[in-house]
């Protein structure tokens, strides 16, 4: 399962995108979804250097494909205060979806997940539900619809 309640954090406080990504990777590590925090962080930050994953509308989708990822995952964070993510629209980011996919995955699973997620994020009502949610449980049920689509 891509999403679980323990991979959701609300009101995350961070000063920069690297700090956000580190905190999100910590969650994945605590849930035993990745083997090495350092290796996965390096992978995600290298991808981020290629081109920012700030997709606009206050949303970022950092991601990485790495042998340190045990099984595909999504970590979700809603920030207490938006931060600069070098987004296409220059808006501060407050909703982050960190995707991780095992390197050995040959079906381009990360592209399929990105496509599903992108479709959902084009729905303003879906994004509004996420922004207005106040509990991890609420967010969990909203995000489950990604796997169903």
What residue spans do the PLM features occupy?
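Cytosolic covalent-transfer regions centered on His/Cys nucleophiles
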Residues: 1-149
């Amino acid at each position: 399962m891509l999403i679980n309640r323990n991979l959701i954090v609300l009101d995350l406080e961070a000063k920069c995108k690297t700090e956000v990504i580190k905190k999100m990777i910590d969650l994945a590590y605590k849930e035993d979804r990745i083997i090495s925090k350092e290796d996965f962080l390096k992978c995600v930050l290298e991808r981020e250097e290629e081109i920012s994953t700030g997709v606009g509308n206050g949303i970022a989708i950092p991601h990485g494909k790495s042998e340190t990822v045990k099984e595909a995952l999504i970590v979700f964070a809603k920030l207490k205060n938006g931060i600069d993510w070098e987004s296409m629209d220059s808006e501060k980011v407050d909703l982050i979806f960190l995707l991780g996919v095992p390197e050995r995955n040959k079906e381009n699973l990360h592209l399929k997940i990105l496509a599903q997620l992108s479709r959902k994020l084009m729905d303003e009502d879906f994004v509004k539900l996420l922004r207005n949610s106040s509990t991890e449980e609420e967010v969990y049920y909203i995000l489950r619809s990604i796997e169903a689509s």
